[in-house]
Swiss-Prot record:
Family stated for the protein in its record: Belongs to the RNA polymerase beta' chain family. RpoC2 subfamily.
UniProt gene name: rpoC2
Subcellular location: Plastid, Chloroplast
Keywords, sorted A to Z: Chloroplast, DNA-directed RNA polymerase, Metal-binding, Nucleotidyltransferase, Plastid, Transcription, Transferase, Zinc
Annotated segments matching region Disordered: 618-640, 663-756
Superkingdom as given in the UniProt entry: Eukaryota
A GO cellular component annotation in the UniProt record: DNA-directed RNA polymerase complex
Name assigned to this protein: DNA-directed RNA polymerase subunit beta''
Catalyses which reaction(s): RNA(n) + a ribonucleoside 5'-triphosphate = RNA(n+1) + diphosphate
Any single biological process term in GO: DNA-templated transcription
A single GO molecular function term of this UniProt record: DNA-directed RNA polymerase activity
Entries under NCBIfam families matching the protein: rpoC2_cyan
Keyword Transcription: yes
Organism, scientific name: Triticum aestivum (Wheat)
Length: 1479
């Protein structure tokens, strides 16, 4: 009793580790038997307590954490911000992944801490808490997944899945989370089974390799050892673990006193003495040399001293112990156990977080900026790296705090920034090298959309290898994928494309372009337009060779009302032959799909076209030449399209008026046609003075082929136009439609039943009254059939038929009326004119081609009723007799039309010529769309209204406008754009090709106004002219590209710079903007919407792509923070940053300063320039930028961005592809190589252990090691000679690889908290590395080249023979090592039985049955077993050799030091391992 009273009473809980310690203490003190007795008592006690407590576990014991909701929300917010940064191109994919992992990891860890405290406070006796935290079952991580959050998963390859599982198992997972969980955590029964099988197979292979290793003798007499020293950063715990149970290889001295002798085994007492000695004199202490299985000299077994103490008791291992099998099982068994651990923890990612420095209080932070340099954190955020220790002061209101930041830390705040209390100001980089936990991983980034690849100037254009497409990035830069949609076109239409064709497509991307498909083609010298073939007809002469320098710019138009994707009309801008626009020239066509006739009625269009009064003549021969060449052009392409060529040119030039007339065929062009009148005209006089204030003018109609149609386009257009002084010309096109289509004429009900004669007096009167300001379009019904020549007609020419008469075998008429048949070369045209026929009495008094208005009463008819419709009177001759005329009265439909609109200042002039502003007027006219004359007809539509832009200007004197295509080049970037200028002098603009032609003087220091209607050309960036010199045009540039680029309107967004800028130089009167809505440009981009532009010039930098910093003028005294903390400042060419006075504007060309009045700027203006890439949401002006992209059109009050997706790529990343290459969605863009923390999960660990054992390790060697081996090869053979050099070289390699392999394997197990003694691993590694391969270069009589032999055997053979044997170290995997043993029976029982036995038989191998397995197979007695002491006689030769070495003291100690030196040399490599067993 008294004894018990003196005992110390410990009242504390005991967990797993405490129990382990207790048992090991008991064994040390009392031995095995007594310990097992005590443990039995413990077991009984435990069961008794557990039964009485009767802990049960129910689902309501799983208490969830209340704070989880907002923690998860916070993390989600952070990762959402991260997504946005990635989208803007601010961080790259790896940084995004890394940061998102850390965000969720930190959240998960924090939740884990919350969980512990939550349990402790709310329910300390909770069974889950008791169970997991006592170590009885489960651990904190598993409970965390039950009640906290499952967190991040890693997939079977060990890569992170960056979508975390936010739920816990108590709440239940959503479907997505469940799938990720199954995939990542590998929870299936199958998987556990497979893992267990893997672990079992690993155990089997390990045992197979080492089953024959037995402790056979006491001492092998080796003089080698491995040094262990705590100096190299080895932890004390590890140091103790390494030393205990080992045998010393050398005496240990402290000072002159020997404290331990060679061959003494190390116990706990000795280790403590070592540690105290090291602590007392850390630098003078010598390393401790110990013996390991690696140094044992025996080939097929191991000696007692090299193995050390037995793992079970504190004495040397007994002779006859099968240490090999023990080793194999010790390593394999934890694997089997650990596979089951995947049940909950499997796949959950764990990482580490850095130490943070936080601010002590609110205040302004200051540090010396010269001591830091800017860098980028691993999350892609800007930071400063300090080289040396940095003092940071934080100035609060009354106190000055000083914080010391260690070197190599990251400072996360700017100088002079205001920081809040507890804000993170720096991150301390961990001092220890975490190399071992990292692995290099490739991550591929794939393109998210089709596009064209661009990169900034930081990427080398030359690929790494000559023909490859891989490029290394020298520094961090952006890659941009400019949005583009690809158009794969059929072969026929592909021949039409030239370089820099610009097209519009909508609809499906991969649809082939049919002949009338929905895409405009615009070419640099031949221009094609397939959306509405009518444009093609009117511009067809652009194909002529003569018109080489015409250019067409179609402007896109987007209609919200219609259900089509985008219906667009092109505005085709033409520049005439000489580059001079006369007044009233049509230079643009405007095609509006809304005026298509939906119900396919046929008919003739008749319209009037008014022009200004001035008259222009041009040489008639010009026109004739054009048409001749045209004819050739068309005939060449007859296989694809059939055209009717121009039969004859008809022009009328009269004295004070001129007319536009089109030709009888389908392809008349109304633009600039002048010629001699060849027709007979009847004129109808009209008095127009009161309306126009102009002298009397006439308008004429051409006989016999026309009707007229009037169209009301006011409400369609939405804005009435003002009419200017105009006259009339006529323009006519035949309407040809295919007879196979069924047409219903919507106007059939409007045919008047009974009409009286129209007297000529009436016609003269009424024609004067309806000439209002609104022009009229008339649509006259007629039916047209185009029949093959061979078809037999059932009706006669000039006969009158009723509705639904049979015309040919299978066509019937839909209208009744007069039939006219016209036979042409390839086909027959059959026209049916509806209406009544009248035979007038006096033929001379009837005028053909009159329109009778509806209100007009017929003079000689008895009834006087109002007519509802206009009718059209047409005079016909009958059979060419002069007396007989008849008149057909045909019902027409009238449309009113909105007259031309004024597009003043579409092209503003330079400021000096501001008064000469060019007026562009809009005029609508009718054209008719024709089908192809082949059997396949894609669509036939009547096109009602075309709009023309007419150049006219207000001055009295007759001006000409110089229109030219301006080419501006800066640093080999060439841009073409249209420039229209009023020039007094007529300069011939047609020079030789590639000539720098003058386009009129550009005033000094003014921006070139030409960039207003610029259109984008591929791979060229527009820039402005740099010097006040003449700028010429470079036309007809031919380059071949392999593929077409189409930019649709959806890829572009427009940003307005100014809402309402007032400027002293601006034009005083503004014309209201014409609502042609936003007109989209050639690539679907908005080119200058037709409206006013202010004439001020803006800050534009030229030819400099700023990706990071944007400059802007700040005039409202507000600070717009553009990107990060860049306050208003300018950067000049030398990259100096100067603060900016808001009154100074920088002229980018001559760097002069202009002083601008303060009130002239109303909004902040960013300096933008063409080709600049802008990221989304950059605050350049009041409206944020909605999309990332490249600016490719800069207008006076807006600019257009081509949508682009930025990707950030860091140094060392590899770019796939070439600059400007077209990429498709899913193509590989960039390959990042980055280091990532290895997932420290045993389920990744086990395969890794297996990889190492199978010698499939992927880690590269340390560069230091290579250098050392080189030094070794230089010096050592000189000292020792070649044989020794080979021996020691192989030794060195093997020793090095052995040590690192042991460390790698230990690291995996230790990470799981599994303690395996190094000796077990060493025994197996010794077998894996004990072979060398005989190399080919030395001919040897003993071994054939390529043969695998044991290292010791090779050494002995080399010593025995005089000749040297050349061999190199080789690392076998455990499977190959099992198949390369000395016993073929053992090999055959492992794998490939037949092959192994057959080979052994052929070679006559002898099996000496030394191992366990072969004896088991053959049923013999196994040669192991402890408990017998057998004395082994040393052979006298061996003994003599040993003593001989002993006697040669000098050589022995030198040699021993040398061998120790080389192991130490290798092991002290700090990059690989500080010593052999460091983790």
């Amino acid at each position: 009793m008294a004894e018990r009273a003196n005992l110390v009473f410990h009242n504390k809980e005991i967990d797993g580790t405490g129990m382990k310690r207790l048992i090991s203490r008991l064994i040390d003190h009392f031995g095995m038997g007594y310990t097992s007795h005590i443990l039995d008592q413990l077991k009984t006690l435990g069961f008794h307590q557990a039964t009485t407590t009767s802990i049960s576990l129910g689902i309501e014991d799983l208490l969830t954490i209340p704070s989880k909701g907002w923690l998860v929300q916070d993390a989600e917010q952070q990762s959402f911000l991260l997504e946005k940064h990635y989208y803007y191109g601010a961080v790259h994919a790896v940084e995004k992944l890394r940061q998102s992992v850390e965000i969720w990891y930190a959240t998960s860890e924090y939740l884990k801490q919350e969980m512990n405290s939550n349990f402790r406070i709310t329910d300390p006796s909770n069974p889950v808490y008791l169970m997991s935290f006592s170590g009885a079952r489960g651990n904190a991580s598993q409970v965390h997944q039950l009640v906290g959050m499952r967190g991040l998963m890693s997939d079977p390859q060990g890569q992170m899945i960056d979508l975390p599982i936010q739920s816990n198992l108590r709440e239940g997972l959503s479907l997505t989370e469940y799938i990720i969980s199954c995939y990542g955590a590998r929870k299936g029964v199958v998987d556990t089974a497979v893992r267990t099988a893997d672990a079992g197979y690993l155990t089997r292979r390990l045992v197979e390799v080492v089953q024959h290793i037995i402790v056979r003798r006491r001492d092998c007499g080796t003089i080698r050892g491995i040094s262990v020293s705590p100096q190299n950063g080895m932890t004390e715990k590890l140091f103790v673990q390494t030393l205990i149970g080992r045998v010393l290889a050398d005496d240990i001295y402290i000072g002159s006193r020997c404290i331990a002798a060679r061959n003494q085994d190390i116990g706990i007492g000795l280790v403590n003495r070592f540690i105290t000695a090291f602590r007392a004199q850390p630098f003078r202490a010598q390393p401790i040399y110990i013996r390991t299985p690696f140094t044992c000299r025996s080939t097929s077994w191991i000696c007692q001293l090299c193995y050390g103490r037995s793992p079970t008791h504190s004495d040397l291992v007994e002779l006859g112990e099968a240490v090999g099998i023990i080793a194999g099982q010790s390593i394999g068994e934890p694997g089997t156990q650990l596979t089951l651990r995947t049940f909950h923890t499997g796949g959950v990612f764990t990482g580490g977080t850095a130490d943070l420095v936080r601010s002590p209080s609110n205040g302004k932070i200051k540090f010396n900026e010269n001591l830091v340099h800017p860098t980028r954190t691993r999350h892609g955020q800007p930071a400063f790296l300090c080289y040396i220790d940095l003092h940071v002061t934080i100035q609060s209101q009354d106190i000055l705090y000083s914080v010391n930041i260690p070197s190599k830390s990251l400072i996360l705040v700017q100088n002079d920034q205001y920081v809040k209390s507890e804000q993170v100001i720096a991150e301390i980089r961990a001092g220890t090298s975490t190399l071992h936990f990292k692995e290099r991983v490739q991550k591929h980034i794939y393109s998210e959309s089709d596009g064209e690849m661009h990169w900034s100037t930081d990427v080398y254009h030359a690929p790494e290898y000559q023909y490859g497409n891989l490029r290394r990035l020298p520094k961090t830069s952006h890659l941009w994928i400019l949005s583009v949609s690809m158009c794969r076109s059929s072969i026929a239409s592909f021949s039409l494309h030239k370089d820099q064709d610009q097209m519009n497509t909508y609809g499906k991307k991969d649809r082939e372009i049919l002949d009338y498909s929905t895409s405009d083609r615009i070419m640099s010298n031949g221009h094609w337009n397939f959306i509405y073939p009518s444009i093609f007809q009117d511009n067809s002469d652009l194909l002529a060779k003569k018109r080489r320098n015409r250019f067409v710019i179609p402007l896109q138009y987007h209609q919200e009302q219609e259900k089509e994707l985008i219906s667009c009309f092109g505005i085709s801008i033409e520049i005439p032959l000489m580059g001079v626009l006369r007044r009233n020239t049509i230079f643009a066509y405007f095609d509006d799909p809304r005026y298509r006739k939906d119900k396919k009625g046929s008919g003739i269009v008749k319209f009037r076209y008014r022009t200004l009064e001035e008259e222009y003549r041009t040489r008639a021969e010009d026109s004739e030449e054009e048409y001749e060449t045209l004819e050739d052009e068309y005939r060449t392409r007859e296989d694809e399209y059939e055209y009717e060529t121009l039969e004859e040119s008809k022009y009328g030039i009269l004295e004070d008026e001129y007319e536009y007339e089109t030709l009888e065929d389908e392809y008349g062009s109304p633009e600039n046609e002048y010629g001699n009148p060849e027709n007979e005209y009847r004129t109808l006089e009209k008095d127009s003075e009161e309306e126009y204030g102009s002298p009397e003018s006439k308008y004429r109609t051409q006989e016999d082929e026309y009707g007229t149609i009037e169209e009301d386009s006011e409400d369609e257009y939405g804005s009435p136009g003002e009419s200017a002084e105009e006259k009339y010309g006529t323009l006519e096109e035949d309407s040809e439609e295919d007879s196979e289509d069924e047409y219903e004429s919507p106007e059939e009900d409007s045919i008047l039943k009974k009409e009286g004669l129209i007297e000529h007096r009436g016609t003269k009167e009424f024609s004067l009254k309806y000439q209002k300001e609104v022009d009229r379009f008339f649509f006259i019904l007629q039916e047209l059939h185009i029949l093959p020549r061979s078809s037999s007609l059932k009706i006669l020419d000039n006969s009158i038929i009723g509705v639904d008469t049979q015309l040919t075998k299978n066509t019937r008429s839909r209208l009744g009326g007069l039939v006219r048949v016209k036979r042409k070369k390839s086909h027959t045209e059959l026209k049916i004119f509806s209406g009544d026929i009248h035979f007038p009495e006096e033929a001379d008094k009837i005028l053909g081609g009159c329109l009778i208005p509806p209100e007009r009463q017929k003079k000689d008819s008895k009834e006087s009723k109002k007519r509802k419709n206009w009718v059209y009177v047409q005079r016909k001759k009958i059979l060419k007799s002069k007396e007989k005329y008849f008149v057909s009265v045909r019902p027409t439909v009238a449309y009113e039309m909105d007259e031309g609109r004024n597009l003043a200042t579409l092209f503003p002039q330079d400021l000096l010529q501001e008064e000469n502003n060019l007026q562009i007027r809009l005029v609508n006219f009718i054209s008719h769309e024709n089908s192809k004359l082949t059997q396949r007809i894609y669509h036939t539509n009547s096109q009602f209204v075309r709009t023309c832009l007419v150049v006219n200007w207000e001055q009295e004197e007759k001006e000409k406008a110089g229109a030219s295509l301006v080419e501006v080049r800066a640093n080999d970037l060439i841009r073409d754009f249209l420039r229209i200028e009023l020039v007094k002098s007529t300069i011939s603009y047609t020079r030789k090709r590639y000539d720098r032609t003058s386009a009129g003087p550009i005033p000094h220091n003014r921006l070139d106004r030409a960039n207003i209607n610029s259109f984008y050309s591929k791979a060229k960036i527009e820039s402005l002219s740099q010097h006040p010199e003449a700028i010429g045009t470079l036309l007809n540039r031919n380059k071949e590209y392999h593929s077409l680029m189409i930019l649709s309107a959806s890829n572009c967004s427009r940003i307005g710079l100014f809402k309402n800028s007032k400027h002293p130089n601006a034009i005083k009167e503004w014309n209201p903007r014409i609502p042609i809505r936003e007109i989209f440009g050639p690539l679907g981009a908005i080119v200058a919407s037709i409206s006013h532009f202010s004439s001020s010039y803006y800050l534009l930098t030229h030819n400099k792509i700023l990706l990071k910093k944007y400059l802007f003028v700040d005039n409202l005294k507000q600070t717009f923070q553009v990107l990060q903390e860049l306050k208003y400042s300018l950067i000049d060419e030398n990259k100096r940053i100067s603060n900016f006075d808001s009154n100074i504007m920088l002229d980018p060309f001559l760097l002069n300063c202009h002083f601008v009045h303060h009130d002239s700027w109303e909004e902040t203006l960013a300096i933008i320039h063409l080709g600049q890439f802008i990221c989304e949401n950059v605050c350049l002006f009041k409206s944020h930028i909605k999309k990332s992209g490249q600016i490719f059109i800069v207008n006076m009050n807006s600019f257009v961005i081509r949508a682009a997706k930025p990707y950030l790529a860091t140094t060392g990343a590899t770019v796939n592809g070439h600059y400007g290459e077209i990429l498709y969605k899913g193509d590989r863009l960039v390959t990042f190589i980055y280091e990532k923390s290895r997932s420290s999960d045993i389920t990744q660990g086990l395969p890794k252990v297996e990889q190492i054992f199978e010698a499939r390790s992927i880690d590269s060697l340390s560069p230091n090691l290579e250098r050392r081996i080189e030094d070794w090869n230089e010096r050592i053979p000189r000292i020792l000679g070649v044989p020794w050099g080979f021996l020691i070289g192989a030794e060195l390699t093997i020793a090095q690889s052995r040590i690192s392999l042991v460390n790698k394997i230990q690291k995996v197990y230790r990470s799981q908290g599994v303690q395996i003694h190094n000796r077990h691993i060493e025994i197996i590694i010794r077998q894996v590395t004990s072979k060398v391969r005989v190399s080919e270069d030395g001919m040897s009589n003993v071994f054939s080249p390529g043969e695998l032999i044991g290292l010791l055997r090779a050494e002995r053979a080399g010593r025995a023979l005089d000749e040297s044997i050349y061999y190199r170290a080789i690392l076998l995997g455990i499977t190959r090592a099992s198949l390369n043993t000395q016993s073929f029976i053992s090999e055959a029982s492992f794998q490939e039985t037949a092959r192994v036995l057959a080979k052994a038989a052929l070679r006559g191998r002898i099996d000496w049955l030394k191992g366990l397995k072969e004896n088991v197979v053959l049923g013999g007695i196994i040669p192991v077993g402890t408990g017998f002491q057998k004395f082994v006689h040393r052979s006298p030769q061996d003994k003599n050799l040993y003593f001989e070495i002993k006697k040669k003291n000098l050589f022995a100690s030198e040699m021993r030091d040398f061998l120790f030196l080389h192991t130490e040399l290798v092991s002290s490599d700090s990059d690989v391992t500080n010593n052999f067993y460091e983790t």
